[in-house]
C-alpha cells in the first residue's frame, strides 16, 4: 500500500474514534420546541420545570388520561399562578 493511503486511513480511523457519534446541533437543542396552550390544570398529573442555560423556561407535564408528556406554554395563567405560589412557598422556608 502507498504511504499516503495508509496515512489517510489512519486519520479517518482516528477521527471516528474521537467522535462520540452525536451531532453538535442535537446536544444543545432545547427539549421543548413547541408548546401546548390548551392543557387544563385538571388534566395534569405531574409538572416538571426544566432549567437549562441555553433555553427559556420550559415546563413538561405528564397528562392523567394517557400518561403522555407534553410541553406547556409557560405564559398560561394557571402556570404563572402555580410558579408564583411555589416560589412564595420556597421563600418562606
Swiss-Prot record:
- Which intervals of the chain are annotated as region Receptor binding? 39-41, 48-50, 60-70
Does the entry feature the keyword Secreted, yes or no?
Answer: yes
What inducers act on this gene?
A: Down-regulated by 12-O-tetradecanoylphorbol 13-acetate (TPA), with 5-fold decrease in expression levels at 1 hour after TPA treatment, 12-fold decrease at 4 hours, undetectable levels after 8 hours and low-level expression returning at 24 hours after treatment. Down-regulated by serum stimulation, with expression levels reaching their minimum at 4 hours after stimulation and returning back to normal levels at 16 hours after stimulation.
Recite the UniProt keywords alphabetically: Chemotaxis, Cytokine, Disulfide bond, Growth factor, Secreted, Signal
Residues that bind heparin:
41-51, 62, 69, 85
- Which locations, inside or outside the cell, does it occupy? Secreted
User: For the motif Receptor activation motif, what are the positions?
Assistant: 22-23
Q: Where is the signal peptide?
A: 1-21
Write out the GO biological process terms.
ameboidal-type cell migration; blood vessel endothelial cell migration; brain development; branching involved in blood vessel morphogenesis; cell-cell adhesion; defense response; dopaminergic neuron differentiation; germ cell development
Pfam families the record matches? IL8
Among SUPFAM superfamilies, the record links this protein to: Interleukin 8-like chemokines (SSF54117)
Tagged with keyword Disulfide bond: yes
Q: What happens when the gene is disrupted?
A: Half of the embryos die by 18.5 dpc, and neonates die within an hour. Mutants display defective B-lymphopoiesis, defective myelopoiesis in the bone marrow but not in the liver, and defective formation of the heart ventricular septum.
Indicate the annotated site residue(s) for Important for dimer formation: 46
Cite the InterPro entries for this sequence: Chemokine_b/g/d (IPR039809), Chemokine_IL8-like_dom (IPR001811), CXC_Chemokine_domain (IPR033899), Interleukin_8-like_sf (IPR036048)
The text of the family note is: Belongs to the intercrine alpha (chemokine CxC) family.
- Assembly description: Monomer or homodimer; in equilibrium. Dimer formation is induced by non acidic pH and the presence of multivalent anions, and by binding to CXCR4 or heparin. Monomeric form is required for full chemotactic activity and resistance to ischemia/reperfusion injury, whereas the dimeric form acts as a partial agonist of CXCR4, stimulating Ca2+ mobilization but with no chemotactic activity and instead acts as a selective antagonist that blocks chemotaxis induced by the monomeric form. Interacts with the N-terminus of ACKR3. Interacts with integrin subunit ITGB3 (via the allosteric site (site 2)).
Annotated function: Chemoattractant active on T-lymphocytes and monocytes but not neutrophils. Activates the C-X-C chemokine receptor CXCR4 to induce a rapid and transient rise in the level of intracellular calcium ions and chemotaxis. Also binds to atypical chemokine receptor ACKR3, which activates the beta-arrestin pathway and acts as a scavenger receptor for SDF-1. Binds to the allosteric site (site 2) of integrins and activates integrins ITGAV:ITGB3, ITGA4:ITGB1 and ITGA5:ITGB1 in a CXCR4-independent manner.
Q: State the name under which the record lists this protein.
A: Stromal cell-derived factor 1
The record lists the organism as Mus musculus (Mouse)
Query: What's the gene?
Result: Cxcl12
